[in-house]
Amino acid sequence: MFFQFNNKINEISVDKIDDSFLTVGYVNGDELLSCSQKFGFAESTVETCRKPTKYFRSGVELYDNYTFTELRIIDIETADDCVALYIRKNMLLVVDVSDKDGSTKRKFMSALRRYAPENTTLEKVIYAFFDSLVAGDIKIIEDIGMQLSSLEEELHEGSVDETFSTVILEKKKLLLSLHNYYEQILDITESIDENENDLFQSDHLMYINNITKRVERLREDVDSLKNTVEHLQDAYSSYLDAKLNNTMKRFTVITSIFFPMTIIVGWYGMNFESMPEFSWKYGYIYVIALSVIVAGTLAIIGKKRKWY
C-alpha cells in the first residue's frame, strides 16, 4: 500500500504515484517485486528482501537516486522483526521482510500520522518511524538496570544461587543485541545525514540529527549497563573463588586436626612386641585419650588463631 501527502493522506496505487508529492509505502516481498522495475531498484536489493537477515550491521547501500538498507528490529517479547528501507527523493518505501505480529507495520502507520499532512516531509517521516521503533526502549533499559541492581544486592548478601551465572549471561546477550541494534540505526541515520546522493533538504536534516542523538543516548545507557554486567561477572567470579577458598580452608583445618591421630594410629599399628602399651591393660584407653587430647588441643588452638 502507498500513501501520498497532499494536504491530506491519500492511499493510492503504485501507478498513481506523483513524484512531486511525498509518497510513503509499506509492501511485502511480492509487491516489491512487481514495482521494483518502475522505481529502478537493483535486483540484488530486491533479492535481499526475500529473507530476513540475522545480522544487525548489514550496511547502507547508496545508489544515484536512492538509498537501500536492511533493518533488524528487536522485539523483547516476541521474535525480532526485519524490514528493508528504500529511500528515494520524496519517497520512503518500507518492505516487510519479517513482521509476523504486525508490530512494525503498526509503528509505521502511527509515524504517518505524527505530523499534519501539509507539514509532513520525507525527513519528518523517517524521524517519526525511527522514533516509534525506539519509543519504549528507555523503559526496557531501566528495567534491565533495576534487575542488575537486584542481582548486585543478592551477590553482596551472598544469597545467589546456581542460576545467577545464567541470568547474567542472558542480560549480557540482550545488552549486546541492543547495542548492535542502535549501532545499526546510527549507521543509517548518519548515512542519511551525509546526504551523498542529494535525496534530502539540508534545512530538514535536523530531524535526522535529533533521532541520531536520541539513539546515541540509548546506546550509551546500554554500554553503561554492559560495564555493570562485566563488573558483576568479575564480582561473581571472586565470590566463587572466596567460597572455594573457605571450603578448602575447612578441609585443611580438619586435616590438620586429625593428622596427628593418623600418626598415632600408624605408630601403634607397627605391632612391635617390645611396645609396652600392648601388654598394659589400660593401653587401649590410653590411645583413645591421647587422640582426643591431641585433637581437642589443636581445635582450641585453631579457634584462637581464627583458622575457622
Which sequence ranges carry the predicted segments?
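Generic secondary-structure boundary/loop-capping signal
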Residues: 57, 152, 189, 197, ...
